[in-house]
Every structure is written in C-alpha cells, then in structure tokens.
Curated annotation (Swiss-Prot):
Protein name: Protocadherin beta-18
Chief location of this protein within or outside the cell: membrane
Known glycosylation sites: 169, 418, 452
Encoding gene per record: Pcdhb18
Localization (cell): Cell membrane
A GO molecular-function descriptor: calcium ion binding
Length: 792
C-alpha cells in the first residue's frame, strides 16, 4: 500500500514538473562570499543587487529573500540598499566544529517569476579559543632500564579553532632527561611524543614533574598546559599485548545506553603485580569520553550516551592497557554507527502567504524545502497535499516545492482552507511529517446586496409619535469587510404629489425606518416607495426593494351628529301627539364617524330623560320611539339626552339634546314653548315651580271642586283657543318645518302651523297654535324618498 502511494505521488511529481514549464525556476550559482566570525550583527557580506544585476526596486518587487540550509536566519537582505548582511554574530566553532573550511550554504529566492540562486558563505576563523587538555595531569610510568631515545606518545590538546589558529606546536618545561617531538596523525592533527634523552635511575630520581604546553598559530598565539608526572619504575620485563591492533565493529544508532559495544582483552606474560592490566582511553576527544566508557578491569566498552548517525558516523577509540609494572600497549577500536530510520522528514518553510485574493489564479502561497537527515532509502522523500483542493504542489530544484492556487477561488463558497502538506520518507517503517497551512481567501466586491424580501409591507397606526420606528428593511451581502458594509437610502419616488422625505426617514447603517411626523389615516391610507441598499466596495454594487406603508386607523374622531342639528342657543324640538301609540317614531338621530372599521360602528343610547320610561332609542339606527301610551299625567315638555358612541378602543362619543313637546292633536291652540336662551339649570327650576303650583292648587280644591275644576279648565282652554285671533311672534329661531333627513320622517305626517308667542309676567312663554296650514303637504319633496341613505 505504501509502495502504491509512493508511485502515485511520484506520478504527481512528474506531472508537476511538466506544469513548471511556465515558471522560471532557476537554480544558478550566484557566488562565494566570506565573512569573519564573531562580527557584529549587520556586518556587510555582499551587495546582491549588484551581483544579480538588478535594481533595489526590482529586488523588492520580486520579494527577494534569503534562506539558509539549516533553516536559521543567519543572514538578511536590506531591502533599501540590496546589501546582504549578517543577522547575528556567527560562531565558526558552533557552526562547523573543527571542520575547515567552514561553509554556510544559502539560497536567494525571488518571485515573479520564481527563481533560486545558490550561494556559499565561508566563515573565516579568528583565534578566539585556547588549546585545552582533557586531562590536566598525565601520569607516565617508565622503567629505569628504558633505552635512551624511547618515545612515549602523549595525549594531545583540543583547540576549537581551525587552520592556522589550531594547535601548531608542543613544548615541555626545561629538563635534562626528556624533550618533545611533534608528529601528524592520520586525521591531519598533530600530537606530542615524549623522547627519553638520558638514562633513568630509580635510585637517583624516582619521579619527575614536567609541564607540557600546547601552542596555536594565532596572532598573538594562545596556549594551554598540562602536568606530566613521570614515575620511574623498577624493571618489568614484558609489556601487555593485544591480540590485534585494530577492532572494527558496527553499532545501530538506536542502541540503548549501557550496551556493551566490545570487550578488549590484553595479555601479559609476567606474573604478580606486573601482570595486572588496567584499561583506559588514550588521547580521547570530548565526544568520545561523553559517548563511551571503559571498564578499567574488564576492558568492556559500553555506551554512555545515545548514538546519532546524523551527527557522528564513526568513532575511533584508542585503548591503552597498562600493567602493574608501568608497561603499556595500545589498540584501536573503530565504531561505525549504522543508520536507522529514526529521523522524520523536515519541512522548512522559506516563504508563506496566508491570504490570497479570491479571483487570483496561479498565486504562489508558499515556498518550502524538505530534508531528511537519514541516508539511503531512509532519506528519500515524497511530498503531497490533500486531494480535491484547488491548489497545486509543484517541485523545484534542491528539494524545494511551490504551493500555488490552481485557479480562481470563490470566497463566498469557501473562505478558508487548511492545506496539509505531508512529507514521507521511504524507510522502514515510514516516517511522516505534516505541516498545515491555513489560507484565508480575501474578498473582492463581486456580490450585490440582496434584500430578504423583494417587497415589504409595514403597518403603522395613525397619530404615531414623530420619529417612531415603524420597521426594519434588511439586506445581506455575501462579501466581507467593506464590500459587505451596506448603506441604506430612500430612492426618489415617481409620485410628484408625495414628498417622501416628509413622511419617512431611514437609518443608513441598519435600515430602520422612522415616521417623520404623525400620520393621519383620514388623509393618507397607504403609500409606497423604494429603498436602496449599496455596499462600499469598488465599484459599488446596489439593489432595491419595494416598501408599502399601510396606515392603520385609530379611533381619533368622535361621532358627529348630523341630525338633529345642535346649536348653542337651544336644543332641537320635536312634537309628539298625545295620541301616539307605543313604538311611535319621534325622531331619528343621524350621525357619522370619520374613522373606519369598527371605529366607525356607531351605537345609540338614551342617557337621561324627563320621563325615563316613556322613550327608548334603538341602539343600531338611532330611532327614538315611545314605549307606552301617553297619559294626561305626562308633562307636556320632555328633555332627552342621547349618546352616540363608536366601537373604538377606547370608544369615543357625542351627545345630543332633544326636546319633545306633547300636543293634544296638532289643532290644539296652546302649548308651552321651550325656553329660549335659558340655561339647563333655569329650565329645571321652572319645571319644578310649575309642579309646585299645580300641586298646591290640587290640594286646595281636592275636597270640593276636583272633578268640576278639571272639566272647567279643559272647556276654558278650548273656548280661549277658539276665540283667539292672530298675535305677533317674538324674534328668535324656531323651526317652521320638520325634515326627516334619513327619509323615513320624524312624524307620521308633515304639518305647518301659524303660531304666536305670548309673554307672561312669570318669565315663561307659551305657544298658541292657531290653525293648521297646508295639512298633509310635504315641505320638501326632495327628501320624500324612504329608506334612503343621506348624502353629505
């Protein structure tokens, strides 16, 4: 399965190589530069603008950048001058160790088109380290019969500097028995040997203490010292012997700590103390001493630290065996570290763009390099991204890859992508590294605002408070940022008679509509206009929606009584014959209401009456009718207070006062006349006075002449009416005719009378009806239609 995945990935890489024909992926050598170590940050290395043959502006336009192989920012490019400068103090010993020359490899990356230039920077050494001996005190045991000219190899000193600044010579403190010679090792390093110049005598001088000095070649030179303690021993005939001078072994780099790598064994044919052998490392570096340890009694060499093939591939161990008499032998153990697939691939990002414009195809998002510190198959890698993404991964030179868009993106469909770059090696087992890049798709103004509805209907009740919120018009824009910031406005209306700005206003930010002033349903029931929504993109895009405002009726108008008409001087008067049957139509109250709906549904009610049980009002049509037969006891004048009420919430009402005069047939000569210009209080007092007079007269004559007086009064009234001629009528309004506005008639017939007004000293006035003129003749033929609705 892994092999199949590798095959597919390789096929994709081959495809990518064909796709790279449109890009300039140069891998040219730029040059070699040098800089001295430990120089301050910002030290000049080279002028890349000059070396590349480009101007400073061109370098900036191409987004030129510097990438080092170890993924550390040792260098940086000054965009203003085109100079390549150091980004930190460079320590040659830290970067390269003892290796000489010390080279730092880096690349120059440029876009538009994409190019790579390889370059090298040599770190020049300065003498900033002194030689150091790992063992500050060395002990040598030399037999007293050792021949003159015998050499003894000493441990060399360590110097982190290289070249001429490394160790160049060794010296020893002045003496007559020894001198120092210098020899070159196979690794190209020098080591000291102690040479015996004069025969030793244990009895004469059993020990020596000498100072060994290591000198480097710097200017001025640096030095390091160690003490050599020489013990002169009595004669030991045989030195230890190793079976072989060179041991070669292999150790996997994942070997555990404490593993016995090898056991070396020396032999000594002597006996006793002279045959007792101790083992130790000789002339071992700091890395060897930190990684291995040797058992001084058994010769077992064990791991002290983990091996790392990528750091050190082999170790050369010099093992020394010393017997009890001071004689020694040496052998070499060569430990070769075997590589295992213990390093996952590395992904080193050189440049990264986390945002891309949605309509920009083939935009470079990232440039990165992959690396695996393992070797062989363990170091071979394949790289790929997820399927079904609108992105391409194109390989370049030196394990560089380019991540770019495959085509134009659509932010409204998907505004963010998480691209996972997977790098796998071909080792066993396979190791994988993943790096996720989060890419934001930036917006362009390619979508106009869209209203939630094509049309809106808003309802507002009349008599609203000015600046009242009546509704919200909402639009959305699938773009982002300023491209989605919507501004609302009222569009000009085509109705020239309507000034829209005097009726409504709109909040430009949130689309809230407000009524400028109080609306009047009776003046304006509904109106329409368009609202525009415009974004702030470039160019601006807009859309519009229709808004219809419907004004709801409020019960703000009280009923208006058309009939009977009211005035400030006196209530309207109707005549009622005493012979009227129950249900007789006295009059009909006609009223209208400017409101609509249930606010204009009117009902009628009798609030007050002189005789409450005599009259009734039909609630739905306003007809005032009698409820019973009239009697002689009923007073001749009745005042009715009628209420006209609508069905609003709360209801409104109007009242009308109606005065009804009772007549004994329409030929009766005398009837009381309603007061003219009297206030209601005075009228009630007059009625009370009349009642008192009648009551007093009745009590006085109750026992004697009650029946005769009653008959006489009636005969007297009839005789007086027959003998009475014409009389003058005082000025003042009095209806000469009665008109039923509704067409049904307030009385069963229409009459016209000649009347005269007679004044009295009591302050009251009476009508005298003389005779009927034009009986049964209608006064207004135009109003003779029955059951017709009035027109106003």
């Amino acid at each position: 399965m892994a092999a199949r995945g590798s095959c597919v990935s390789r096929q994709r890489q081959v495809l990518f190589l064909f796709l790279l024909g449109g890009l300039c992926l140069a891998g040219s050598e730029l040059g070699r530069y040098s800089v001295t170590e430990e120089t301050e940050r910002g030290s000049f290395v080279a002028n890349l603008a000059k070396d590349l043959g480009l101007g400073v502006e061109a370098l900036a336009a191409k987004r030129t950048r510097v990438v080092c192989d170890d993924n550390k920012q040792h260098l940086f490019l000054d965009s203003h001058t085109g100079d390549l400068l150091t980004n930190e103090k460079l320590d040659r010993e830290k970067l390269c160790g003892p290796t000489e020359p010390c080279m730092l490899y880096f690349q120059i990356l440029m876009d538009n088109p994409f190019q790579i230039y390889r370059a090298e920077l040599r770190i020049l050494d300065i003498n900033d380290h002194s030689p150091i001996f790992q063992d500050k005190k060395m002990i040598l045991k030399i037999l007293e019969n050792t021949a003159v000219g015998t050499t003894f190899r000493l441990e060399r000193a360590q110097d982190s500097d290289g070249g001429r600044n490394g160790i160049q010579n060794y010296t020893i403190s002045p003496n007559t028995f020894f001198h120092i010679t210098v020899h070159n090792s196979d690794e190209g390093m020098i080591y000291p040997e102690l040479v015996l110049d004069k025969a030793l005598d244990w009895e004469g001088q059993p020990e020596f203490s000498l100072t060994l000095t290591a000198l480097d070649g710097g200017s001025p030179p640096r030095s390091g010292t160690a003490t050599i303690h020489i013990l002169v021993l009595d004669i030991n005939d045989n030195a230890p012997q190793f079976p072989q001078e060179l041991y070669e072994i292999q150790a996997p780099e994942n070997s555990p700590i404490g593993l016995v790598v090898i056991k070396v064994t020396g032999e000594d044919v002597d006996s006793g103390v002279n045959a007792e052998i101790s083992y130790s490392f000789f002339d071992a570096s700091e890395d060897i001493r930190a990684t291995f340890q040797i058992n001084p009694f058994s010769g077992e060499i064990t791991l002290k630290a983990l091996l790392d093939y990528e750091f050190i591939k082999s170790y050369k161990l010099n093992v020394q065996a010393v017997d009890g008499g001071g004689l020694s032998a040496r052998c070499t153990v060569l430990v070769r570290v075997l590589d295992v697939n213990d390093n996952a691939p590395e992904l080193i990002m050189s440049s990264l763009v986390n945002e891309v414009v949605e309509n920009s195809p083939e935009t470079v998002l990232a440039v990165f390099r992959i690396n695996d510190r393992d070797s062989g198959e363990n170091g071979k890698m394949v790289c790929h991204i997820q399927e079904n993404l609108p992105f391409l991964l194109k390989p370049s030179v030196d394990n560089f890859y380019i991540l770019m868009t495959e085509g134009a993106l659509d932010r409204e469909s998907r505004a963010e992508y998480n691209i996972t770059i997977t790098v796998s090696d071909l080792g066993t087992p396979r190791l994988t590294t993943q790096h996720t890049i989060r890419v934001q798709v930036s917006d362009i103004n390619d979508n106009a605002p869209a209203f939630n509805q094509t049309s809106y209907t808003l309802f507002v009740r009349e008599n609203n408070s000015p600046a009242m919120h009546i509704g919200t018009i909402s639009a959305t824009d699938s773009d982002a940022g300023s491209n989605a910031h919507i501004t609302y406005s009222l569009l000009p209306t085509q109705d020239l008679q309507m000034t829209l700005t005097s009726l409504v206003s709109i909040n430009a930010d949130n689309g809230q509509l407000f009524a400028i002033k109080a609306l009047d349903y009776e003046a304006l029931q509904a109106f329409e206009f368009h609202v525009g929504a415009t974004d702030r993109g470039s160019p601006e895009l807009s859309s519009q929606a229709l808004v219809r405002v419907v004004v709801l009726d409020d019960n703000d108008n009280a009923p208006f009584v058309l009939y009977p008409m009211q005035n400030a001087s006196a209530p309207y008067t109707e005549l009622l014959p005493r012979t009227a049957e129950p249900g007789y139509l006295v009059t009909k109250v006609v009223a209208v209401d400017r409101d609509s709906g249930q606010n204009a549904w009117l009902s009628f009610q009798l609030l007050k009456a002189t005789e409450p049980g005599l009259f009734s009002v039909w609630a739905h049509n306003g007809e005032v009718r009698t409820t019973r037969l009239l009697s002689e006891r009923d007073v001749p004048k009745h005042r009715l207070l009628l209420l006209v009420k609508d069905n609003g919430d709360p209801p409104r009402s109007a009242s009308v006062t109606l005065q009804v005069l009772l007549v004994d047939g329409f030929s009766q000569p005398y009837l009381p006349l309603p007061e003219v210009a009297h206030n209601p209080t005075q009228g009630e007092e007059d009625v009370l006075t009349l009642y008192l007079v009648i009551a007093l007269a009745s009590v006085s004559s109750l026992f004697l002449l009650s029946v005769l007086l009653f008959v006489g009064v009636r005969l007297c009234r009839r005789a007086r009416a027959a003998s009475l001629g014409g009389c003058s009528v005082p000025e003042g309004h009095f209806p000469g005719h009665l008109v039923d506005v509704s067409g049904t008639g307030t009385l069963s017939q229409n009459y016209q009378y000649e009347v005269c007004l007679m004044g009295g000293s009591s302050g009251t006035s009476d009508f005298k009806f003389l005779k009927s003129i034009y009986p049964e003749v209608h006064a207004y033929s135009s109003q003779d239609n029955s059951d017709g609705n009035p027109t106003f």
